Amino acid sequence: MNSNSTIGRTTLGESDTISLSFSEPSSSLNSRSTDVVFASTSTLVPQQGSLTSLPPVSSTATPTYYSTSLTYDETLHTSIDVSSTSTLVSSTDSSSSSEQDTYSSQYDPATSSYSIITPSMSIFSSTSPMSSSSSITSEWSSLTSTTPTLSXSATSLSSSWSSLSSPSSLLVSSSLSLSLSSSYSDTKLFSFDSRSSIFSPSTPTVISPSYTYLSSISATSFQISTTSELSXSWFSTISSPSTTSNKDTTFPSSSRNTSTSFYSSSLSSTNDFSTISKSSKLSPSASSSTVSISTISVPTSSSVSSSSSKVPSNRPSSSSSSDDTTSAYSSTYTFQSLQSTTSSSIPPXTQTPSTSTISTSPIPTSSQVFNTXAISSSEDSKTIYYFYTQTYDITDSSTTFVTGLPTTIAVAKSEVTSFSAPSSTITADMSFYQHWLDGSLDNNKNQGTSKTNTGTIVGSVVGSVGGILICVLVVWFMLVRKRKAKRHFKENDSFCHEIGRRTGFPTTAQAKEASLQAQDSGSQQRNTETASANNPFSNEFNFKARGNPPPVPPPRNVTAXNGSFQNMRSNFMDQENRFSYGSSFTYSSLGSSTQGGFSTLSSNSIRLGXGLDNDISHDERNTVQNNSQGFLREII
């Protein structure tokens, strides 16, 4: 006996996709204006090292008008996609799922501050970094589902057959419930704080401050909650009639599947944006302030709900299967937005520039106590630096106050063993205090030190060069003087000077000067001739003024054999012995020595004979010895 059986299989496929999106642009515009004070009285309250009392200070400022605008544009776009797919390959399916997710984002307050000092002093800008943190916290998430595992529960199945059997029925019932709950909360807090000060001093002691305070806070929070519920139920009937035959057995079967699906979703969002700004206005007359507050609030809310239902029906058979699905989908969207704007501001008033003069009466000064005993120090390899507070009495024509200024003293380690801060008070004027405030006091000291060092260097260089020049001049003067003295000494020790000194004329310079003066004038020449009569050496170097030599005396008994020699001697005497010194030098001494006589010349000894003759008597020789020229001849 052969039997073939075919059992039908029911397959249920379900896919639902829901996409929700919405965008919400919102913008806000906020304008503010602030008037700056014309004239006001300000009081400086500095820290350590600056003004500690409260003197009145007059200030004058010109009005400044400015306005700022803030535009905030926010666009929110949210897209939610929900997709679920379930497949049933069984006759019984039971599943349940529950999930809840919470998303939270918290932004810390961010503060940015800056200050501008105008118009001619300096610009200072400081910005604190913006800090933000984002955290995603999942409160709880649980999922209990038996759909993927396709486990069967609460199922009753009964089937019986026999050769003569009756049909039995199968009832399958299933319910699926899906609940999704999601909440989204976002809170933003933005804080902006700006303070600016404008100093426009017209005199060194006049300071005009003004300030503007702006605070803006925007908060945005919205919550998205989505709840989804999915319920499905279907009915399945399996009929199994049975017939018995001798040859084959056939099990025809029929199935009917009915499914109903319902999906509902709701979405709600709330957005609240608010801006608060505050500006201050100082009145020039009463020094009062006016506060202008501008608030913009833009709350929005939206809700979206959707629902869907599906009714699939399947009727499979043993040999073929068909799928007939009937679905119905409906969705409802509800959007509600509420925007409210509240603004309150004071428009700027046009005011003409004016100048106010405030006369202040002297205020009694209060005694100030400064901790001058506190001393701190630092040191390096050679120097110790002491830091303490010095008390100053600042005096002006209308203001007097006492303040403490930090002071630094540098002392060498080898010169100090202990140090104590001075307790006396130093009196200074307002210009000193003003220089200390703007930092130019130390610059002036440095400049003075630099100028002193420069003057020292220049003076050293000039003094060195001058000293070298003076030393060179002194050495040159000494060398020239020594050269002159040496030349004069040579002239005094010469042969001519010795002869002139013996004859009553100690120097030869007088003869030189007399000969030069004789050429210049006739009177001096006559005086020179008069002096020449007494001084045989006056015309020593004046060769042109000399006359012809005297005639040669006749020879005494000269023999013929000596005639040729006498002529030659006469010619020689005429050409060579023309000078006074040469004329006095004759050969008479030679002749006398050869003949054995002494001074046997005639009375005229200017041109003496050769002295070679031997006919001179002894009486004539004695007469020549008495002549005045014999002494000069013996000297030569």
UniProtKB/Swiss-Prot annotation:
Cross-link type Glycyl lysine isopeptide (Lys-Gly) (interchain with G-Cter in ubiquitin), residue numbers: 512
Subcellular location per the Swiss-Prot or TrEMBL entry: Vacuole membrane
GO cellular-component term (any): vacuolar membrane
Feature: compositional bias, Low complexity: 19-32, 87-108
UniProt keywords, alphabetically: Glycoprotein, Isopeptide bond, Membrane, Phosphoprotein, Transmembrane, Transmembrane helix, Ubl conjugation, Vacuole
Glycosylation positions in this chain: 4, 257, 492, 557, 562, 626
TM stretches of this protein: 457-477
Region (Disordered): 1-32, 87-109, 237-271, 299-326, 339-363, 510-553
Similarity field: Belongs to the TDA7 family.
Annotated protein name in UniProt: Topoisomerase I damage affected protein 7
